[in-house]
Amino acid sequence: MAKKPIIGITMGDPAGNGSEISVKALADSSVYERCRPIIIGDANCMEKAVKILGKENEIKIHAVQDVKEAIFEFGTIDVYDMKLVDMKKHMYGKVSKMCGEAAFQYVVKVIDLAMKNEIDATVTNAICKEAINMAGHHYSGHTEIYADYTHTNKYTMMLAHDDLRVVHVSTHVSLRQACDKVKKERVLECIRIANNACKAIGIQEPKIGVAGLNPHCGENGMFGVEEIEEIQPAINEAMEEGINIPEKKPT
């Protein structure tokens, strides 16, 4: 029988609710039936979350410095202890450089562990973009951090649920900038990424739908020309490459 995958879970911003979410999630025994979870964060913060939730009699925190030290047993939460948070200064709901630095380093560490094959997959709790930028790390979100630290030039975010997967042309930018980013090459790049990603996760014949930008997809130019000038040409080229876009137009 194959071993259960090791899942590295970042604790998220220490001033947020990631530690509590993690405790609640790992208080469910079914999680351990499917995988071997380990939190990448601060053991002291996790201990605090356990107390806040009143689960001291159910959950114990096991701090480790190496994934190999984890025991992966229900009732015990393994924490790869980064020791980055001064609990005397810790305050929930307060944006700070300290918490931004910690949250950022948790993400960097989980990526490093995955790249070294010490864990099989990563899961992230929420970070505060303001806090990580306050700490000097100028990223707009997890996607950009992952891309940078895995040396990936072409990327986008994918949201997945059951049979639906959504890929973004743009992510954390203003609405004005998002509209400006709807260009043929970027749309085509995202179509290709979506198609390849679906195949990578086992969907043999992906069906790609491409959203329009304007009301009623521009109504043949009445409400905008992006569909005509940028999106349709990207769809045409993608179909020429053999990518299956059933509607053959933005929808």
Predicted feature descriptions by range:
Residues 1-142, 185-209, 213-251:
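Contiguous, glycine/small-aliphatic-enriched amphipathic segments in soluble metabolic enzymes
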Residues 159-189:
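Ligand-binding beta-strand-loop-alpha-helix segment within the catalytic cores
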Residues 76-79, 157, 166:
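Conserved beta-strand scaffold positions in the cores of enzyme catalytic domains, especially
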Residues 147-160:
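FAD-binding core/adjacent interface of flavoenzyme oxidoreductases
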Residues 73, 154, 163-165:
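A generic structural signal for well-ordered coil/turn residues at beta-strand boundaries
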